[in-house]
């Protein structure tokens, strides 16, 4: 079972997950990594957890088991290389230390359609690394758009992050979280209702944009 129970991307295949902070990267000297991570963490706290868009997120958040990494990549090729490094690191690291990784990439795949196409590359990397069934990638983007929606439809904001993000997830953590939630099938529909009630003005009031 996938994290579709929380939300879907344009191709209806992925969704949000478990969060918290344990580390950050060294990256472009012209970019304030702390500010990028702070903006991303605020989005997690105010939107993902605050609006209960993913009921599984809060428990992991308080355990501080998320690795935040700001990528300096400016090309898809460079991002892929770093993604593979982070996939291997997550696979090699005890889940008690790092349960999930948020790979934030402000300088590449800023166009959502390009980003969405890259998700197939990410899936292929997992397969090539023999990590299928162990890890998967969830997707968030400032211009996230579900299939069959208009750009400004409020439901798209369930997966809109301050910066493009690839979230690296452990399959076994996903399975345990879904098994523990009594009505996982209803999460996506509930999220749409939450966003419709909140509206665009309510979303803007959360101040979860980029730094």
Regions found by a protein language model. Give the residues of each.
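Expand to "…catalyze enediolate/carbanion chemistry for C-C bond making/breaking, isomerization
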Residues: 25-211
């Amino acid at each position: 079972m996938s994290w579709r129970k929380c939300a879907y991307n344009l191709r209806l295949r992925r969704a949000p997950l478990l969060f918290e902070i344990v580390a950050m990267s060294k990256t472009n000297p012209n970019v304030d990594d702390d500010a990028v991570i702070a903006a991303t963490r605020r989005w997690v706290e105010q939107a993902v957890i605050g609006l209960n868009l993913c009921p599984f997120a809060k428990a992991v958040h308080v355990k501080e088991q998320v690795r935040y990494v700001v990528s300096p990549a400016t090309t898809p090729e460079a991002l892929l290389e770093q993604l593979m490094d982070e996939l291997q690191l997550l696979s090699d690291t005890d889940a008690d230390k790092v349960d999930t990784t948020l790979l934030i990439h402000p300088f590449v795949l800023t166009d959502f359609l390009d980003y969405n196409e890259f998700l197939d590359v990410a899936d292929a990397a997992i397969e090539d690394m023999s990590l299928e069934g162990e890890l998967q990638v969830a997707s968030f983007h400032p211009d996230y758009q579900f299939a069959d929606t208009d750009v400004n439809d409020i439901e798209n904001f369930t997966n809109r992050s301050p910066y493009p993000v690839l979230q690296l997830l452990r399959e076994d953590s996903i399975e345990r979280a879904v098994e523990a939630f009594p009505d996982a099938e209803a999460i996506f529909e509930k999220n749409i209702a939450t966003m419709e009630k909140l509206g665009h003005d309510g979303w803007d009031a959360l101040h979860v944009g980029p730094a």
